[in-house]
Amino acid sequence: MASRKEGSGAAGGGFGASKGKGKAATTGDSAVKQVQIDGLVVLKIIKHYQEEGQGNEVVQGVLLGLVVDDRLEITNCFPFPQHTEDDADFDEVQYQMEMMRSLRHVNIDHLHVGWYQSTYYGSFVTRALLDSQFSYQHAIEESVVLIYDPIKTAQGSLSLKAYRLTPKLMEVCKEKDFSPEALKKANIAYENMFEEVPIVIKNSYLINVMLWELEKKSAVADRHELLSLASSNHLGKSLQLLMDRVDEMSQDIVKYNTYLRNVSKQQQQKHQYQQRRQQENLQRQSRGEAPLPEEDINKLFKPPQPPARMESLLIAGQINTYCQNIKEFNAQNLGKLFMAQALQDYNN
């Protein structure tokens, strides 16, 4: 279900980009160095997941705003409605047109600047997300994808990150050549596939005053639940997902090693054929006969098709994401452990 929804995001990206490209480009053509998000957008994304997100099913939506110099300002958003395969009459392009027309009538920013998606235990580095973001970023250079992690957020801190495809990966995706030689030539590794853009959440002055008043009213006892260490399920699930991706990587390595063995075997066969051919020509020349005609050796020995390596890079990137999440999670729990111990000693 997640992959189907991600794939539909790619179609929406192409439409939204074509609608907003000209207007967005007038505000600034430089690369995005910061993403500024209104607090209302964050609340809408969280509300969307709470209403429609279930288990590992992701929710997605469109980000609206504008580009100012090297800063991308996200001022509003709207969700993609959940629908099943049976909803054949649903037209996502028409849905986006109607939403943007309605927003324009009430004088709200209606230019597409990217999209958002929830994630399940950090599982977002997929081919579907890559294709969707490429569709957006190819049409509007400043487009970003926001990844919201509801499970991390439930642990006590908002988890919202903005990502873009690196220029190197954009060039490779344009060429659509994901062979080992092409990725090696472009110097593409999982570390430089995505770039994270810093996020700043901005609220109005009235909202800041209200938050300050709420913070003064909240008692210290209300926050003790944030020191809870009952999180073995989260760690266990993350480790299980990590092991699954490692198994996939192991299978992919076996396939690639098989390809390398086949290439090496064919090279040996070509070398042996050339040696036999050369010896036959020498014998024919000694008998005064004409040498054998030259043949296209590549037609006789068709090279094996190299496997695409993009999936391997995505799996490696996902493994790295899981490792970073586990590292951060354990660091937070260690901090909670020391704080809980200090609080207990203080109360005693």
Swiss-Prot record:
Q: Where is this region: Disordered?
A: 1-25, 266-304
Protein's UniProt keywords contain Endoplasmic reticulum: no
Q: Does the keyword Cytoplasm apply?
A: yes
InterPro entries assigned to the protein according to its UniProt record, in alphabetical order:
eIF3h, eIF3h_C, JAMM/MPN+_dom, JAMM_MPN+_peptidase_M67A, MPN
Q: Where is the composition biased (Low complexity)?
A: 266-285
Which keywords does the record carry? Cytoplasm, Initiation factor, Protein biosynthesis
Spell out the subcellular localization from the entry.
Cytoplasm
What function does the entry list?
A: Component of the eukaryotic translation initiation factor 3 (eIF-3) complex, which is involved in protein synthesis of a specialized repertoire of mRNAs and, together with other initiation factors, stimulates binding of mRNA and methionyl-tRNAi to the 40S ribosome. The eIF-3 complex specifically targets and initiates translation of a subset of mRNAs involved in cell proliferation.
Q: How does it assemble?
A: Component of the eukaryotic translation initiation factor 3 (eIF-3) complex, which is composed of 13 subunits: EIF3A, EIF3B, EIF3C, EIF3D, EIF3E, EIF3F, EIF3G, EIF3H, EIF3I, EIF3J, EIF3K, EIF3L and EIF3M.
Give the protein's recorded name: Eukaryotic translation initiation factor 3 subunit H
Q: Which organism is it from?
A: Gallus gallus (Chicken)
